[in-house]
Amino acid sequence: MFARWRSMAAIAVLVCSAATAAQAQEAAALTAVPPKEGDFVARDFKFANGESLPEIRMHYTTIGTPQRDAAGQVTNAVLILHGTNRKGGVFLVPSFAGVLFGQGQLLDASRYYLILPDQLGAGLGKSTKPSDGLRAKFPHYDYADMIGAVRLMLRDGLKVDHLRLLVGTSMGCMQGFMWAESHPEDIEAMMLLSCLPTQVAGRNRMVRKLMIDDVRLDPGYKNGNYTEQPYGLRAALGHLLVVASAPTLWQTEYPTAAAADKFVNDYITENLKTTDANDFVYQYDASRNYDPQADLGKIRSHVMLVNTMDDFWNPGEMGVAENEMPKAKNSHFVLLAITKETRGHYTFFQAAVWQKYLGQLLDELGR
């Protein structure tokens, strides 16, 4: 059961609505049932560092219908957590939802209750974030705060206090480890993709620091009170492009200097339209105290971790997961070789590449 997340007064304000006509039409081709969107508002939200906000809004998408046992507990909830600065809706694409959410597929939405939240602070989402108005006065949240916000949304908003499955990608993968350690009774199984169960350090942290400093050290940042996006955000997005790269694929798709240059220019131009500097900095800094290594033995969930050799963020050659995952009972680790189907860090969007391992995990649960 979900315990109360610290001592706070939370009031659920649910505003459920069907997705837009365009979204519903697109989702109809990808899922067994259409998605619905809603918002949950928690009052007097306290952050781990002592800061607080009078209220936070958590936006979410749900697909399917909750099923309850005789005690009223939801038995078919699947929570899917997105990566840094994304939103829950990023999974509603053919390569993910089209492979998993349809009739007869592994996460058939007519069987499971799928929950896709926009995480606290995430720039592309509709949940509360710095760019809503507080800018650099926004509380300096971390992953524990983000998990707390989602747990409140689940328990007090959607009346879900138990997860059949947590699917976590990138940041969501890291949060999965933290969640299963701090609240081991919450989650039956976790399908985790593109992360490592150890402190963000080495090259991973160095790149995060470079991106954060690209923005914060730009005079145009003005301590977060800029009137236009600081130029340093462009450099930060450039760093992000490199670490998110899929070298084998990109060599094939952009085989000339002109093609590569055009891709970079298009990528920067498009991402500058949707990225806010404060949102960006806050999200990447939220990993600053992530370190699940010491408590892996507390995890009770069945765990499947899948990484790829072409993931710049989480290099497979370091052997971290092979050494650490055995500490978590009922855990498995798979390191995928580089193929024409892998996409570097973002291989998690290509469900066809790893869905057989999800199937194995569900088999352990008896489906």
Which residues does each PLM region occupy?
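Conserved alpha/beta-hydrolase "acid-adjacent" motif
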Residues: F312-M318
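Short beta-strand/loop motif that positions the catalytic acidic residue
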Residues: I299, L305-N307
